[in-house]
Curated annotation (Swiss-Prot):
Residue ranges that the Swiss-Prot or TrEMBL entry lists as coiled coil: none
Keywords, comma-separated and alphabetical: Ribonucleoprotein, Ribosomal protein, RNA-binding, rRNA-binding
Protein name (Swiss-Prot/TrEMBL): Small ribosomal subunit protein bS20
Species for this entry: Brevundimonas vesicularis (Pseudomonas vesicularis)
Family: Belongs to the bacterial ribosomal protein bS20 family.
Region Disordered: start-end pairs: 1-20
Comp. bias (Basic and acidic residues): 11-20
One GO MF term: rRNA binding
Protein's job: Binds directly to 16S ribosomal RNA.
A Gene Ontology term for the protein's cellular component: ribonucleoprotein complex
């Protein structure tokens, strides 16, 4: 998904995984 919104969501999920 090259959509900016989807990328933002993926980045947010990645950040959450990093905190995990």
């Amino acid at each position: 998904a090259n959509n900016p919104g989807a990328r933002k969501a993926i980045r947010k999920i990645e950040a959450r995984t990093e905190v995990n």
